[in-house]
């Protein structure tokens, strides 16, 4: 996995990258101090790439499939807050922070394999469902990832009594299992002792459900319209309060009605962001 930066890599970013697992980084530039830090990662084998910040891709993209070449214009759509002016729901309040999150969601979707749905919270992408044949499958997949992100912030998880000699990747893997339905895999005698100083109490299904119910203020973007209200039902369970989607379904009324049921503010952008 590579880290892609849109600005010059500074010392703070390089210090953060040094402790995170990745195969390389690409950026338009690096400060001398940042480059010196990155050179020490992976014993000097960390891949550091610099891209020309003035590079502009071709306006026409092409793809060859079994000898047939397909061409189309590159997606140059500008994602701005102007896309959020058409709000057909009863709740029309989309504050500035939510508009920022919706923009992040749509920008993410612009470069994500369709069909795709993206959840964003506090300026961070917390769940992406991509490459699915069904829109609701995208919403479920991204919602499940958003739930995992939130569960990792549960006090029981934050206070897991890890041994000092357990490395960060192993801690991360243990947390992933601990918050899943397979939590017993890290808690039996003979296994928990390798990870923890004392045996943790499990995070029960009821506790997880109650914790997820506390998640609010999530923004969701979709790369095309929602055909049914079931997408909204699933999104609501992961704390979604703001939605941006293209609109244009013959069942838009049902989708709007479901948003109103949960007081969700939804903008219809009129913009499809399909990417194949």
Residue ranges of model-derived segments:
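ATP-dependent carboxylate/acyl-activation modules
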Residues: 1-242, 249-276
């Amino acid at each position: 996995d590579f880290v892609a930066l849109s600005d010059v890599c500074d010392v703070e970013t390089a210090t953060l990258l040094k402790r995170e697992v990745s195969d390389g980084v690409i950026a338009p530039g690096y400060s001398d101090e940042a480059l010196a830090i990155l050179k020490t990662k992976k014993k000097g084998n960390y891949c550091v790439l610099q891209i020309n910040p003035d590079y502009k891709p071709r306006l026409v993209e092409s793809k060859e499939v079994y000898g047939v070449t397909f061409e189309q214009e590159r997606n140059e759509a500008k994602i701005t807050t102007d896309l959020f002016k058409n709000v057909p729901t009863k709740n029309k309040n989309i504050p500035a922070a939510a508009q920022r999150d919706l923009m992040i969601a749509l920008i993410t979707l612009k470069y994500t394999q369709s069909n795709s749905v993206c959840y964003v919270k506090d300026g961070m992408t917390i769940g992406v469902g991509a490459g699915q044949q069904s829109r609701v499958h995208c919403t479920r997949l991204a919602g499940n990832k958003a739930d995992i992100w939130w569960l990792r912030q549960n006090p029981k998880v934050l206070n897991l009594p890890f041994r000092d000699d357990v490395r960060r990747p192993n801690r991360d893997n243990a947390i992933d299992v601990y918050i899943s339905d397979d939590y017993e895999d890290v808690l039996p005698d003979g296994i928990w002792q390798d990870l923890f100083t004392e045996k943790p109490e499990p995070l029960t299904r009821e506790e997880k459900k109650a914790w997820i119910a506390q998640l609010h203020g999530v923004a969701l973007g979709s790369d095309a319209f929602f055909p049914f209200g079931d997408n909204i039902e699933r999104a609501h369970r992961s704390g979604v309060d703001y939605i941006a989607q293209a609109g244009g379904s013959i069942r838009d009324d049902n989708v709007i009605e479901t948003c109103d049921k949960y007081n969700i503010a939804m903008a219809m952008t009129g913009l499809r962001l399909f990417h194949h």
